[in-house]
């Protein structure tokens, strides 16, 4: 009998250990097009009212993975090529998912993160401060994003198979720099000594495979702003991380057009708050001298202060950095590579979520430096003076400087005309001088969120912390350490913590309390005051412990429903017209008869307004290669890196417009006979929309 008991216990022990070594999940990945109106709508990111879309360089996509454990616990994570995420948008996605799947998906187990591209159409956030430079809410942007976000999760769900998840990491050194190094230096020296760099250089990858080890997808997190494309860009772009995703997907979806194919590869945002891709550093535009370290200003006559990337222009910089990120991810996926350090993810799936009313949050936190318990509280949302100064990725307007800790009577007068802060607000935010008292502004509706979304997704021994803002480098490091320690203390397991930035709702930035004192751009944009980061540390520690204990928490107060109060100054398309003796689709400028490698093809069509039809999951044009006498094959689309689509009005009163299509012929281009086809819709002056098509004559691409 004793031997039987020992054998049974041994069997249980072996079974437990085997469970740690290998775990079977249901895994699925999906992708969908979320490209909004590419023309006449401002882009979201730089808050530059002049940055109005004029066409497409690359389409933007949403990419999802779904994981379910053996008990049926399920989570969904989405990385969207968008500036950030809004709660109204997430709520609409959940509504559509529940109409299809019932309560399988809900607010607690779905996380939607933005890559932070600054080159996609805005107007979807439903808070005035974030939509004001877009001239308000844009229903067309909102709808295409809501449907695409829903579709990518649906496709991941429909693709669920038994599979495994592997985690791996690598160091990528030549992609990011800290754009506020003087703020970073405010953090304690003993803390900084624990890290080699002032930005996170680790790329973390989750690889999804089926039980035959066939690769399904790979999601990569790396801390870098998607701002290789600067605020002069007018073409829809997924920027550096989006290009990296296109390269990764091209590798594992051979002979497929961008955005097509079963393999899904994503590069997701992390604690990128103070992290720039413009690795050549900030310089004065005229003199070439370095900018002032504290204020990021240049002396009179030396030009503006801005940073640049490693390429000769923003397109090449985007390409270079995207390639470096893709190469790092490919190295991890190549099992024969020295970079491959993959280990299997094991354990159950859990999730937890809570809405937190930040201005009314009161708590306490232990300060390891002073070894005392500090009281913490939130403030009404407010933006500081340095917010208006912009960053070295995109300088602001007027004479504002980063690092400003004093106010100005003139700007205070302007501020108070909009909404005046109370004396309590002013004291609460010190040393930030308040430029916009957004928490007190209510006309025509809420300017910034007061209620935030805090969420954790646990997939085995990996925890994804979904944060509603842009954490700086050290702010993210502290949060990761806090969550890891809490999970270890309660669950007794060592976890890998991933920060997913700009998730579920957007509330600008979060810096450490020390960085807050410097009041550079990121600190001025930390909207809930100097204790913002401490509150998040408190909340996420509590949520981690509750999740590890399988406890439920109070849902918290829901953000307000604002769909019915949205305003917009954007007009729709009135009508389209064309010059006499032409028609829509007429090729005004034909290609040359012959081109060589590294040359650019340009053609021009008489066109309708692209806002008439977004051609979602389709394309405004195709570049086709002749296969034989009866067959042409699509070689490139408007989602391809090698192409650009530029639209412009030629007569506003008569509704005339033209479409320029550019194709850069790369060394990888096959020689042969090509032609370009443009598809569109025009809006008739008496009503209705009608399709049209135009086709160039054929031309030859010579062998190199």
UniProtKB/Swiss-Prot annotation:
GO biological process, one term: long-chain fatty acid biosynthetic process
Enzyme class per UniProt: hydrolase
General function of this protein: Hydrolyzes the sphingolipid ceramide into sphingosine and free fatty acid at an optimal pH of 6.5-7.5. Acts as a key regulator of sphingolipid signaling metabolites by generating sphingosine at the cell surface. Regulates synaptic vesicle exocytosis and trafficking by controlling presynaptic terminal sphingolipid composition.
One of the Pfam families matching this protein, by short name: Ceramidse_alk_C
Naturally occurring in which organism (per UniProt): Drosophila melanogaster (Fruit fly)
Family recorded in the similarity comment: Belongs to the neutral ceramidase family.
PTM per Swiss-Prot/TrEMBL: N-glycosylated.
Xref: InterPro entries: Ceramidase_alk, NCDase_C_sf, NEUT/ALK_ceramidase_C, NEUT/ALK_ceramidase_N
Compartments (UniProt record): Secreted
Catalytic residue positions: 276 (nucleophile)
GO molecular function term, any single one: N-acylsphingosine amidohydrolase activity
Note: Overexpression rescues retinal degeneration in arrestin and phospholipase C mutants, probably by facilitating membrane turnover and endocytosis of rhodopsin in photoreceptors.
Tissue-wise expression: Widely expressed in different tissues but enriched in neurons at all stages of development.
GO cellular component, one term: cytoplasm
Signal peptide residues on this chain, from the entry's feature table: 1-23
EC number, UniProt record: 3.5.1.23
Listed name of the protein: Neutral ceramidase
Glycosylation site residues: 230, 362, 550, 598
Main localization, broad class: secreted
UniProt entry keywords in alphabetical sequence: Glycoprotein, Hydrolase, Lipid metabolism, Secreted, Signal, Sphingolipid metabolism
Catalytic activity reported: an N-acylsphing-4-enine + H2O = sphing-4-enine + a fatty acid
């Amino acid at each position: 009998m004793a031997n039987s008991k020992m054998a049974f216990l041994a069997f249980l022990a072996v079974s437990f250990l085997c469970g740690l070594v290998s775990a079977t999940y249901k895994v699925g990945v999906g992708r969908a097009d979320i490209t909004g109106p590419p023309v006449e709508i401002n882009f979201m990111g730089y808050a530059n009212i002049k940055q109005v879309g004029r066409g497409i360089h690359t389409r933007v996509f949403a990419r999802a993975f779904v994981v379910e454990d053996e008990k049926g616990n399920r989570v969904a994570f989405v990385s969207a090529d968008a500036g950030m995420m809004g709660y109204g948008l997430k709520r609409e996605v959940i509504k559509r998912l529940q109409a299809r799947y019932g309560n399988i998906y809900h607010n607690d187990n779905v996380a939607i993160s933005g890559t932070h591209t600054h080159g996609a159409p805005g107007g979807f956030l439903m808070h005035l401060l974030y939509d004001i430079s877009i001239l308000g809410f844009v229903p067309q942007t909102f709808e295409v994003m809501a449907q695409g976000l829903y579709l990518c999760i649906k496709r991941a769900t429909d693709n669920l198979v038994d599979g495994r998840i592997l985690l791996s990491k690598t160091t990528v050194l030549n992609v990011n720099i800290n754009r506020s190094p003087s703020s970073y230096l405010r953090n304690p020296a003993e803390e900084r000594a624990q890290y080699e760099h002032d930005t996170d250089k680790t790329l973390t990858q989750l690889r999804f495979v089926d039980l035959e080890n066939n690769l399904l997808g790979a999601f990569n997190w790396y801390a870098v702003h998607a701002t290789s494309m600067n605020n002069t860009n007018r073409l829809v772009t997924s920027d550096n991380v989006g290009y990296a995703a296109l390269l990764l997907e091209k590798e594992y979806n051979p002979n497929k057009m961008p955005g097509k194919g079963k393999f899904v590869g994503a590069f997701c945002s992390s604690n990128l708050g103070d992290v720039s891709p413009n690795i050549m550093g900030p310089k004065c535009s005229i003199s070439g001298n370095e900018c002032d370290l504290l204020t990021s200003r240049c002396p009179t006559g030396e030009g503006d202060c801005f940073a640049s990337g490693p390429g000769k222009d923003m397109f090449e910089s985007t390409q270079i950095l995207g390639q470096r990120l893709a190469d790092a991810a490919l190295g991890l996926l190549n099992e024969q590579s020295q970079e491959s350090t993959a280990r299997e993810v094991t354990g159950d799936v859990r999730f937890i979520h809570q809405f937190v009313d930040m201005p009314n949050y009161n708590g306490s936190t232990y300060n390891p430096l002073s070894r005392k318990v500090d009281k913490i509280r939130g403030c009404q949302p407010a933006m500081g003076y340095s917010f208006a100064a912009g960053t070295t990725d995109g300088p602001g307007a007027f004479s504002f400087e980063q690092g400003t800790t004093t106010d100005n009577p003139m700007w205070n007068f302007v501020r108070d005309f909009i909404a005046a802060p109370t004396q309590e607000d002013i004291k609460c935010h010190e040393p930030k001088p308040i430029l916009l008292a957004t928490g007190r502004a209510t006309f025509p509706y809420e300017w910034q969120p007061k209620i935030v979304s805090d969420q954790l997704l646990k997939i085995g021994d990996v925890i994804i912390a979904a944060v509603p803002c842009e954490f700086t480098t050290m702010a993210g490091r502290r949060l990761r350490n806090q969550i890891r320690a809490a999970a270890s203390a309660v669950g007794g397991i060592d976890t890998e913590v991933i920060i997913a930035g700009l998730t579920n709702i957007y509330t600008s930035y979060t810096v450490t309390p020390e960085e807050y004192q410097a009041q550079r751009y990121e600190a001025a944009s930390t909207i809930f005051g100097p204790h913002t980061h401490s509150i998040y540390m408190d909340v996420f520690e509590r949520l981690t412990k509750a999740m590890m204990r399988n406890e439920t928490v109070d849902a918290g107060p829901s953000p307000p429903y604002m769909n019915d109060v949205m305003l917009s100054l954007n007009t729709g398309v009135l009508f389209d017209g064309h010059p006499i003796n032409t028609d829509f689709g007429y090729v005004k400028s034909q290609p040359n008869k012959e081109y060589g490698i590294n040359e650019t093809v340009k053609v021009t069509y008489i066109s309708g307004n692209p806002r008439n039809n977004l051609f979602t999951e389709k394309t405004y044009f195709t570049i086709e290669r002749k296969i034989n006498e009866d067959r042409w094959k699509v070689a490139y689309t408007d989602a391809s890196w090698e192409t650009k689509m530029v639209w412009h009005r030629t007569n506003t009163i008569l509704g005339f417009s033209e479409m320029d299509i550019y194709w850069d012929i790369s060394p990888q281009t096959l020689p042969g006979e090509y032609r370009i086809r443009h598809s569109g819709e025009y809006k008739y002056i008496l009503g209705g929309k009608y399709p049209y098509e135009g086709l160039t004559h054929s031309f030859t691409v010579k062998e190199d």
